[in-house]
Amino acid sequence: MRFTFLLPSDDISGGTRVVAIYAQQLQARGHEVLVVNCAPERLSPRQKVRAILQRDWSKLLADGVPHPGHIALSGVPQKVLDRPRAITAADVPDADFIVGTWWETVVQMHRLPASKGRKVHLIQGYEVWVTPQATAQVNAALRLPNLKIAISSDLKQTIEEKLGPLDMSVVPNAVDLTQFNAPPRSKQGSPTVGFVYAVAPIKGADICARACELARLQVPELRVVAFGADPADAQVPLPRDTAFFCRPAQDKLKEIYASCDAWLFGSRLDSFGLPILEAMACRTPVIAVPIGAATDLLGDGVGVLVAKESPEEMAAAIVAMCRQSAADWQTCSERAHRKAHVYSWDDAANLLLASLEQA
């Protein structure tokens, strides 16, 4: 079969990683795959003036210059449009299925002729967080007639509580078990926690950072590790002496996860939370808020769930994990690893194909 995926851009976000992996999985099964995405957004005149006033030369130099995203790094066939614009029929080949992964690309997909493939909305988030004005457009996009597949039961529930039943199936994300894995290990010599750093408030890096600072009041030797696509910003400060990796190489990620005794997930809004699974696959227990797939993944003693927006509760969980005996921590580590490895991207791709074929 022939598949076309539509993306607004190629970046190193979790959502783009999911598309890249599905494209690889489908290609490995003998299907024809193409990913179509726009060129990077350019700075507006106002943004350029602000960058000059702030002497942010790196932002000016990077304006419009593409960083290799997950699609480019995956090696799957890719078509990059010349500039940020709507995707039209002339941009995509005829196919059996065409998959939109963002509300705007879903609207664009809806306008395409039937020859471009049966329309599929791979729902990776409830994107009302973009701007308050976008809510009506996002909801309208979700109501368009197409085959809908959500990446978590939490996301399906959140959307259908707002919009009513949408005949939506669920195919959970998995983790690349060849990329994310680690041998058994003991606790670190100095207690160490990590989290994904991002400036966007919805990602909750400020909650994780504050939790680390509070935990250090009781565990002064606590080490903190973080990585992210955003450079460190004074508006979202990292804890003192954080080992921070900006845009680390993909093969470096498992080392970062495996260097920690616990991984923190504090998102205010997330449709899944791939770092939870990635850390677990590297034998690192996770302390998380009940957002995205966290509730499904961290039950039965696999990890620790804490209240939303509560750095105090997250800090208490950090302290408790730091004070665990070596044997108890080892048990948590093995449970996390086992949970992450019970379901693979191969399984997810099989479920995706089954959903498409049965529809």
Identify the residue ranges that each predicted region occupies.
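Conserved donor-binding/catalytic core segment of Leloir-type glycosyltransferases
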Residues: L147-A150, R185-K203, A209-R216
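Carbohydrate-associated surface elements
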Residues: D154, A174
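Nucleotide-activated donor-binding/catalytic signature segment of Leloir-type glycosyltransferases, i.e.
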Residues: P231-K254
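Short alpha-helical donor nucleotide-sugar binding micro-motif in glycosyltransferases
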Residues: E255-C260
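Aromatic "clamp/platform" in nucleotide-sugar-dependent glycosyltransferases that forms part
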Residues: R268
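Short hydrophobic beta-strand element within catalytic cores of glycosyltransferases
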Residues: P285-A288
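Conserved acidic donor-binding segment of nucleotide-sugar-dependent glycosyltransferases
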Residues: D300, V304-P311, A320-A326
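A short, well-ordered alpha-helix in the C-terminal region of glycosyltransferases
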Residues: A327-V342, A354
